[in-house]
Swiss-Prot record, chain B:
Residues 1-26 form a transit peptide. Belongs to the ATPase epsilon chain family. GO terms for molecular function: proton-transporting ATP synthase activity, rotational mechanism; zinc ion binding. NCBIfam families: ATP_synt_epsi. GO terms for cellular component: mitochondrial inner membrane; mitochondrion; plastid; proton-transporting ATP synthase complex. It comes from Arabidopsis thaliana (Mouse-ear cress). Transmembrane segments: none annotated. Mitochondrial membrane ATP synthase (F(1)F(0) ATP synthase or Complex V) produces ATP from ADP in the presence of a proton gradient across the membrane which is generated by electron transport complexes of the respiratory chain. F-type ATPases consist of two structural domains, F(1) - containing the extramembraneous catalytic core, and F(0) - containing the membrane proton channel, linked together by a central stalk and a peripheral stalk. During catalysis, ATP turnover in the catalytic domain of F(1) is coupled via a rotary mechanism of the central stalk subunits to proton translocation. It is found in: Mitochondrion; Mitochondrion inner membrane. SUPFAM superfamilies: Epsilon subunit of F1F0-ATP synthase N-terminal domain. This is ATP synthase subunit delta', mitochondrial. The keyword Ligase does not apply.
Length: 70, 203
């Protein structure tokens, strides 16, 4: 049962819906007026630390952060 | 054949409930979604075990569709960081579906619509509130409840027109000079979003 719906151009280029949606949201945020733009960018900041495990022990953690480290 | 099934089942219910106080809700107590031939075959093979339940036995029943069309549409409009409208009763919403602007009135046929970047307007009497949505989905239910979810939604006066023009020119240029498929796709998305914002501001 093949679907006849045309594949959206971003899916044909290998992008997932979430990536597409996030790109759209970022573009909209970039076009905001000043106090709202700063608020939205602040709201979307992420900060997380990731460590892969091998042999039951965590390896060196990788830190990904939008907040400048003091 | 069906009479046999209920007799067999009720026999096992009696047997099971006498064994333990905490019996799970039996499939006959919930909306019956089990095939009776399957249940009979199961009973022959494993008479002491409850037949396995299907996921639909655990689902809450769907909200009932009122027999007459309600006068108002109940809208739930949510973003990842806030609930913009919760259970608000309105007359109509117009959503930017990927197939075009879609007007939703109470009693709309149940639909799942993917939204493209565009304007959503909420009409309540003479009051119209417009938001520019970056993308998302709209779930329209049979009981005249609309769940609209978007990643970003901004009122039109929060948008800076000069930034939009700059962005549009930048992405049009990127589209012309893009090489890989992915770059082309990203540039195309940029052009589409900025054109949509432009149209929204001038429309």
């Amino acid at each position: 049962m093949a679907s006849n719906a045309a594949v959206p151009f971003w899916r044909a280029a290998g992008m997932t819906y979430i990536t597409y949606s996030n790109i759209c949201a970022n573009l909209v945020r970039n076009c905001l007026k000043e106090p709202f733009k700063a608020e939205s960018i602040n709201r979307e900041k992420v900060h997380f630390s990731l460590s892969k495990w091998s042999d039951g022990k965590p390896q060196k953690p990788v830190l990904r952060s939008d907040t400048p480290q003091v | 054949m069906f009479k046999q099934a209920s007799r067999l089942l009720s026999r096992s219910v009696a047997a099971a409930s006498s064994k333990s106080v905490t019996t799970r809700a039996f499939s006959t107590e919930l909306p019956s979604t089990l095939d009776s031939t399957f249940v009979e075959a199961w009973k022959k093979v494993a008479p002491n075990m409850d037949p396995p339940q299907t996921p639909s036995a655990f689902m809450k029943p769907r909200p009932s569709t009122p027999s007459s069309i309600p006068t108002k549409l109940t809208v739930n409009f949510v973003l990842p960081y806030t609930s913009e409208l919760t259970g608000k009763e309105v007359d109509m919403v117009i959503i930017p579906a990927s197939t075009g602007q879609m007007g939703v009135l109470p009693g709309h046929v149940p639909t799942i619509a993917e939204l493209k970047p565009g304007i959503m307007s909420v009409h309540e009497g003479t009051d119209v509130k417009k938001y520019f949505l970056s993308s998302g989905f709209a779930f329209l239910h049979a009981n005249s409840v609309a769940d609209i979810i978007a990643v970003e939604a901004v009122p039109l006066d929060h948008i800076d027109p000069s930034q939009v023009q700059k962005g549009l020119a930048e992405f049009q240029q990127k589209l012309a000079s893009a090489t890989t498929d992915l770059e082309k796709a990203e540039a195309q998305i940029g052009v589409e979003v900025h054109s949509a914002i432009n149209a929204a501001l001038s429309g």
